[in-house]
């Protein structure tokens, strides 16, 4: 039985990647190295900009993270697509947290803006997810806006992130 909490540790998130958090039919997070979250600091079914659900999570930045050695040589920066993927990861996690079943798949994003970067000298990345709408019919789908902050400064914004849960991924 899933124990619903308002926050989750790295160990909890790793258990999710193994399918041990939401059960065999629930969504999973990716495993390291693609897991872009170290902890979830707050989850609510209300709150956020639209009062329809909110998630706050963090990633601790270390200069030895895998992407800094290849993106780019002599000009290391965290790929922006990893921050976007982290926001999709959190939308999918939230869908499992509210009881959704199935495998999570990113379905799109309307708009992404990058106004800063994550360098090896950064300390903490914070993700803020503001849910706009949750659909719980045949397809479970979350729609949200997101922000990525680096050391307390907003550096990415995403409008209309979409993630769906599929009980049969061959139909996706």
UniProtKB/Swiss-Prot annotation:
One of its GO terms (cellular component) is cytoplasm. It comes from the Bacteria. Belongs to the thioester dehydratase family. FabA subfamily. Keywords: Cytoplasm, Fatty acid biosynthesis, Fatty acid metabolism, Isomerase, Lipid biosynthesis, Lipid metabolism, Lyase. InterPro entries: FabA, FabA_FabZ, HotDog_dom_sf. GO terms for biological process: unsaturated fatty acid biosynthetic process. Necessary for the introduction of cis unsaturation into fatty acids. Catalyzes the dehydration of (3R)-3-hydroxydecanoyl-ACP to E-(2)-decenoyl-ACP and then its isomerization to Z-(3)-decenoyl-ACP. Can catalyze the dehydratase reaction for beta-hydroxyacyl-ACPs with saturated chain lengths up to 16:0, being most active on intermediate chain length. Transmembrane segments: none annotated. Disulfide bonds: none annotated. It is found in: Cytoplasm. This is 3-hydroxydecanoyl-[acyl-carrier-protein] dehydratase. Pathway: Lipid metabolism; fatty acid biosynthesis. It catalyses: a (3R)-hydroxyacyl-[ACP] = a (2E)-enoyl-[ACP] + H2O; (3R)-hydroxydecanoyl-[ACP] = (2E)-decenoyl-[ACP] + H2O; (2E)-decenoyl-[ACP] = (3Z)-decenoyl-[ACP]. The active site is at 71. One of its GO terms (molecular function) is trans-2-decenoyl-acyl-carrier-protein isomerase activity. Its EC number is 4.2.1.59, 5.3.3.14. Homodimer.
């Amino acid at each position: 039985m899933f124990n619903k909490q308002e926050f989750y540790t790295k160990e909890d998130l790793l258990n999710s990647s193994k399918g041990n958090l939401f059960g065999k039919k629930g969504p999973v997070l990716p495993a390291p190295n693609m897991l872009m979250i170290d902890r979830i600091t707050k989850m609510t079914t209300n709150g956020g900009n639209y009062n329809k659900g909110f998630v706050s999570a963090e990633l601790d930045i270390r200069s030895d993270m895998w992407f800094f050695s290849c993106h780019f040589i002599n000009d290391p920066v965290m790929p922006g697509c990893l921050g976007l993927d982290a926001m999709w990861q959190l939308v999918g996690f939230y869908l499992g947290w509210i009881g959704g079943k199935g495998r999570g798949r990113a379905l799109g994003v309307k708009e992404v803006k990058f106004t800063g970067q994550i360098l090896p000298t950064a300390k903490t990345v914070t993700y803020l997810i503001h849910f706009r709408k949750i659909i719980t019919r045949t397809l479970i789908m979350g729609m949200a806006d997101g922000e990525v902050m680096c050391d307390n400064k907003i550096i990415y914004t995403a409008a209309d992130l979409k993630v769906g849960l599929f009980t049969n991924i061959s139909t996706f």
